Amino acid sequence: MAELQMLLEEEIPGGRRALFDSYTNLERVADYCENNYIQSADKQRALEETKAYTTQSLASVAYLINTLANNVLQMLDIQASQLRRMESSINHISQTVDIHKEKVARREIGILTTNKNTSRTHKIIAPANLERPVRYIRKPIDYTILDDIGHGVKWLLRFKVSTQNMKMGGLPRTTPPTQKPPSPPMSGKGTLGRHSPYRTLEPVRPPVVPNDYVPSPTRNMAPSQQSPVRTASVNQRNRTYSSSGSSGGSHPSSRSSSRENSGSGSVGVPIAVPTPSPPSVFPAPAGSAGTPPLPATSASAPAPLVPATVPSSTAPNAAAGGAPNLADGFTSPTPPVVSSTPPTGHPVQFYSMNRPASRHTPPTIGGSLPYRRPPSITSQTSLQNQMNGGPFYSQNPVSDTPPPPPPVEEPVFDESPPPPPPPEDYEEEEAAVVEYSDPYAEEDPPWAPRSYLEKVVAIYDYTKDKEDELSFQEGAIIYVIKKNDDGWYEGVMNGVTGLFPGNYVESIMHYSE
């Protein structure tokens, strides 16, 4: 500030005065030089003196101008710096004023609001009462809890047909069914094993019959005696019987048990009927009233003699009596018709009513069991099919030859866990078995195509939506002749050809015993 004041008050005004003085001096010097040149005799000397004065005058004027210009520029720089300082101060003052205005505005806005009561507490608060730790209790693992979840192996049920009609016909062709039949009950195991109540009957070798023995179909009408070595009740063996089977149907032999079967096919609905335990002594028949029974300790006692021929009136009675006895749960056999009485003092004895006989002997209705249905036409015409199936049980004219003793128990090899061994009087138990027609063990029906891709069984009910489709129930047998890329199959069922969704059926699986 002092420097600027000195410049403004001393140096700059001094420089200006020096310039004015130089101006006056230059005029006097010019007059002197002019007069000297005119008056001097030595013109050359006067000229040189004039040149010297001129040079000195120019130099002094230039110095004075330079000094004054420097002082002015220095004054301008000082003033510019002062202006910048003043500008900064003004900006600071303006910002301070703005801040003050903001504070005042916020204060005015805060007046219009209400106070909020905030409680100053910790974010995490420890519970007042600590929970007591729960003692660990080990629970046994339930391996069957997930058996009904997921897409596991679909086991085909052989002797059970669902009575609920799940109409899946409205589903799109590419979408699998969203419902499936209820899962079968588990019998104490994690998965369906070989001892499941729905599995196929175990293959059992048929009893051996002597060559000189001729089966008698009317022996079912004779008194019988239970073998003394029998220790297992018939009810202890899981057996399933079909009401649609005929007396000439195939027996569940090793061929029928080698298939994985489910449902009843298109033959009929199978009905599970438990085999009742035979009573120790049957009521005395009308034809042998007053006759004492045979002793129970005689395992090889001779059979009671029966007439060689049966009256013709017994055939319709036996055929007509089959249905009510079946419905009654096998209450008791029909009283036998005999012409000779058993020996005195012996109890009734049980014998097998099913014997493997000659394959060329035609079956007769009169010799059927009292609780069996009369043989159907298909069972009589499918005699040749029995060559590939189990032992054929036929009814022949009566014979007086006594039956052989029960065969010795033969071992049956099976996978683990093995089934319980059959009792020694197994063929006596076979006498109470109702024959059924196995749609999987028999040969293909007449309406089956000569060549087909595979044989499938329906696992859901389906109602057709179009004319070229098939409608079927669960358990129906279909022969697939073509598989389309869109998931639909073309097959034959009961002689009718049509389309059906491939996800509603499943191939009949085979397994080796």
Curated annotation (Swiss-Prot):
Q: Where is the composition biased (Low complexity)?
A: 242-272, 283-325
Q: What is this protein's function?
A: Regulator of actin cytoskeleton dynamics underlying cell motility and adhesion. Functions as a component of the WAVE complex, which activates actin nucleating machinery Arp2/3 to drive lamellipodia formation. Acts as a regulator and substrate of nonreceptor tyrosine kinases ABL1 and ABL2 involved in processes linked to cell growth and differentiation. Positively regulates ABL1-mediated phosphorylation of ENAH, which is required for proper polymerization of nucleated actin filaments at the leading edge. Contributes to the regulation of actin assembly at the tips of neuron projections.
Question: In the record, what disease is this protein associated with?
Answer: There is evidence, including phenotypic data from ABI2-knockout mice, that loss-of-function variants in ABI2 may play a role in autosomal recessive intellectual disability.
The top of its lineage is:
Eukaryota, Metazoa, Chordata, Craniata, Vertebrata
Which GO molecular-function terms appear in the entry?
cytoskeletal anchor activity; identical protein binding; kinase binding; proline-rich region binding; SH3 domain binding; signaling adaptor activity; ubiquitin protein ligase binding
Signal peptide residues on this chain, from the entry's feature table: none
What name is this protein filed under? Answer: Abl interactor 2
t-SNARE coiled-coil homology domain segment(s) = 45-107
Q: Report biased composition (Polar residues) as residue ranges.
A: 217-241, 376-399
The keyword Iron-sulfur is assigned to this record: no
Please state which protein family the record places this protein in: Belongs to the ABI family.
Query: Which keywords fit this entry according to its UniProt record?
Result: Cell junction, Cell projection, Coiled coil, Cytoplasm, Cytoskeleton, Disease variant, Host-virus interaction, Intellectual disability, Neurogenesis, Nucleus, Phosphoprotein, SH3 domain
Q: Name one Pfam family in it.
A: SH3_1
Q: How does it assemble?
A: Component of the WAVE complex composed of ABI2, CYFIP1 or CYFIP2, BRK1, NCKAP1 and WASF1/WAVE1. Within the complex, a heterodimer containing NCKAP1 and CYFIP1 interacts with a heterotrimer formed by WAVE1, ABI2 and BRK1. CYFIP2 binds to activated RAC1 which causes the complex to dissociate, releasing activated WASF1. Interacts (via SH3 domain) with ABL1 and ABL2.
Claim: Coiled coil is one of the keywords in the record = yes
What is the gene called? ABI2
Region Disordered: start-end pairs: 167-431
GO BP: any one term? cell projection morphogenesis
Q: Which stretches make up the SH3 domain?
A: 451-510
* Domain notes per entry: The SH3 domain is critical for binding to ABL1 and ABL2.
